[in-house]
UniProtKB/Swiss-Prot annotation:
It is found in: Cell inner membrane. The chain crosses the membrane at residues 42-62, 70-90, 103-123, 131-151, 178-198. It comes from Pasteurella multocida (strain Pm70). Its EC number is 7.2.1.1. This is Na(+)-translocating NADH-quinone reductase subunit D. It is a multi-pass membrane protein. One of its GO terms (cellular component) is plasma membrane. Pfam families: Rnf-Nqr (PF02508).
Length: 208
């Protein structure tokens, strides 16, 4: 049984110290595509946490029975099954959000973070550790996603969760929206500034 300190490290380390987007530069595509609104970013975060945690758990449980030659296929089959489950739940209970997320829920199957943790960690670790590692990496991914979405939605439209925060000029207020922040390239710049900020606070993450 894994000790509490180790589990805490697995849960919290990916959020700041070993963030999958900010340090490992993984999962960038969805960070560009689903961060125009906080709502979609949060839903995507929960979807990735669910898929990463349970794929890690199931792969770890059967890791000793998976032939090395087909391990990637087995991993993808498990991940794909979980992604289909998430997609069907969204279609049933949050159809509007499902439409907004479009193909990007399905593309969780090929998300480097999910595949990377399955191969690098779950195949070599105990089930509980693997499950917690999946949650931690999902949280780390989500922290960047939500941060980017917060900035993009607020500056781009003056809203958060679709509710007006800054009254726009068009509605008789003072705020002029900046449509640039609603375009995908803006997410690149925001992520770049976040990475710069993290590495300023943590110089040990700067590549030599």
């Amino acid at each position: 049984m894994a000790d509490t300190k180790k589990l805490k490290g697995l849960l919290l380390s990916p959020v700041m110290d070993n963030n999958p987007i900010a340090l490992q530069i993984l999962g960038i595509c969805s960070a560009l595509a689903v961060t125009t609104k906080l709502e979609t970013a949060i839903v995507m975060t929960f979807a990735v946490i669910f898929v990463t945690a349970f794929s890690n758990l199931f792969i770890s449980l059967i890791r000793n029975y998976i032939p090395n030659s087909v391990r990637i296929i087995v991993q993808m089959a498990i991940i794909a099954s979980l992604v289909i489950l998430v997609d069907q739940i969204l279609r049933a209970y949050a159809y509007g959000l499902s439409k907004q997320l479009s193909v990007f829920v399905g593309l969780i199957i090929t998300n480097c973070i999910v595949m990377g943790r399955a191969e690098a960690f779950a195949m070599k670790s105990q089930p509980l550790e693997s499950f917690v590692d999946g949650i931690g990496n999902g949280l780390g991914y989500g922290a960047i996603l939500v941060s980017v979405a917060f900035i993009r939605e607020l500056i781009g439209s003056g809203k958060l969760f679709g509710m007006t925060v800054f009254q726009t000029i068009q509605d008789g207020g003072w705020y002029q929206t900046n449509g640039l922040f609603l375009l995908a390239p803006s997410a690149f710049f925001i992520i770049g500034f976040i990475i710069w900020g993290i590495r300023t606070l943590k110089p040990n993450q700067v590549e030599k």
